[in-house]
């Protein structure tokens, strides 16, 4: 059962202004995209890439992009190198470009450390043998060697310490060998000198023994002679 149109309702509809409402339009790129049927087969084709701190357009237009950890770290490093006055007012891209123009940055912190380029490391290893010669290692004390090895690699430091220990032991052995040889030569010279003195003393003893026998024989002849020989006995004594 249909009711007749009310005059008040018709008047309200005629007076209603539809132009004051905005018309919602669908984005054109959404229609020209991949069909709905193909979305199920490629689930990752419609997923946008994750935004980074270097792409401010990916963030909403009403707010500024939030700085990431890497951006904050680079800005802090730049502030330490150039001072806070020069860093203020720089964008992240300008800060990174300025850091790259400054050269390699020494990074020490939770993100890692800068150990130098391979060329610098090779040059350091080449300079170490020139700086630490055998004579320098032997004459250098342990404290001085540890001070010189600061900043050197652990393997290189262990190798130099082992080399110094080997040179020290070799020097001690050579010194002991030289000392023993010197003592041996001294003892041999002393033995030869004492042997010569012994031979001289033996010759002197033999000479004195012969003189003793000669004097004893003369004494026996004088005592066994005639009675007149007693007056001349004192001449031979």
UniProtKB/Swiss-Prot annotation:
Location in or out of the cell: Cytoplasm; Nucleus
GN (gene name): Nrl
Species the sequence originates in: Mus musculus
Record keywords: Activator, Cytoplasm, Developmental protein, DNA-binding, Isopeptide bond, Nucleus, Transcription, Transcription regulation, Ubl conjugation
Phenotype of gene-disrupted mutants: Photoreceptor precursors in retina produce only cones that primarily express S-opsin.
Residue ranges of the region described as Disordered: 26-64
Residues of the bZIP domain: 159-222
Name the record gives this protein: Neural retina-specific leucine zipper protein
SUPFAM superfamilies: A DNA-binding domain in eukaryotic transcription factors (SSF47454), Leucine zipper domain (SSF57959)
Family per record: Belongs to the bZIP family.
């Amino acid at each position: 059962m249909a009711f007749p149109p009310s005059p008040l309702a018709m008047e309200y509809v005629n007076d209603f202004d539809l132009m004051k409402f905005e018309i919602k339009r669908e984005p054109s790129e959404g229609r020209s995209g991949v069909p709905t049927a193909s979305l199920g087969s490629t689930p990752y084709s419609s997923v946008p890439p994750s935004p980074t701190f270097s792409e401010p357009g990916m963030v909403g237009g009403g707010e500024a992009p939030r700085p990431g950890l890497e951006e904050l770290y680079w800005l802090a490093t730049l502030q330490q190198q150039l001072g806070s006055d020069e860093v203020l007012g720089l964008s992240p891209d300008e800060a990174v470009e300025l850091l790259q123009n400054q050269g390699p940055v020494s990074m020490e912190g939770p993100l890692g450390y800068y150990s130098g380029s391979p060329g610098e490391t090779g040059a350091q290893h080449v300079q170490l043998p020139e700086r630490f010669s055998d004579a320098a290692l032997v004459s250098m004390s342990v404290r001085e060697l540890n001070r010189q090895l600061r900043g050197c690699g652990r393997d290189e430091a262990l190798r130099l310490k082992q080399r110094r220990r080997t040179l020290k032991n070799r020097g001690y052995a050579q010194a002991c060998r030289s000392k023993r040889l010197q003592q041996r030569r001294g003892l041999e010279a002393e033995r030869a000198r004492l042997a010569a003195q012994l031979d001289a003393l033996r010759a002197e003893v033999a000479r004195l023994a012969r003189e003793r026998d000669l004097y004893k024989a003369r004494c026996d002849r004088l005592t066994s002679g005639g009675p007149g020989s007693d007056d001349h006995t004192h001449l031979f004594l």
